[in-house]
Amino acid sequence: MVHCPRCHRPGAAVLCADCQYWQQLLPWLDGQAQHLFAYHSPIQTYFERFKRQGDYQLAAVFAADIGDWWRTRRRHYDAVIPVPTDPVRARQRGFDPVTALFASVLPLTPVLEKQGTTLEQAQQDRATRLTTRQPFIYQPKRGVRLRQWRRILLVDDIYTTGSTLYQTAAVLHAAGSDAVMDTFTLAR
């Protein structure tokens, strides 16, 4: 299957419109977007139950798949940074879905926080997602040496337009990182 070389969106073997948009805004960003599954009906149903209905037990369903993916790539990354969830939604749900999906398998280094409450991605159209104001901030942690990391893996649950992942990369870059930043999501 032919796809965008950066985000793997099905289509032509050239950068898709979303990746071209982000390349213009963040020309220094040259990482790759990786995912395990296409976001189709079974995965949509999974996320409906996991995130919308708050079925925490579903967090473990793909742990083996994520672990298999990670075993072949872990030596390439100095840090794995989870995309933070809106704290209000995490309290309502009872858990942070990104941490729930990845913490048992990946060595997460949470150095980002989401500030304020924003409309859920699922409730926004593509244009709104692409132009959402920066909701993330870098929170330095003791022992974390952001500037020493050469390659960072940003993890999130779903990749749609890339806006969330690009916004997190921009915050890390503004905080002094010049690392290559790849992304990994369960679904795209």
Regions found by a protein language model. Give the residues of each.
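Glycine-rich phosphate/pyrophosphate-handling loop used in enzymes and phosphotransfer proteins
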Residues: 1-188
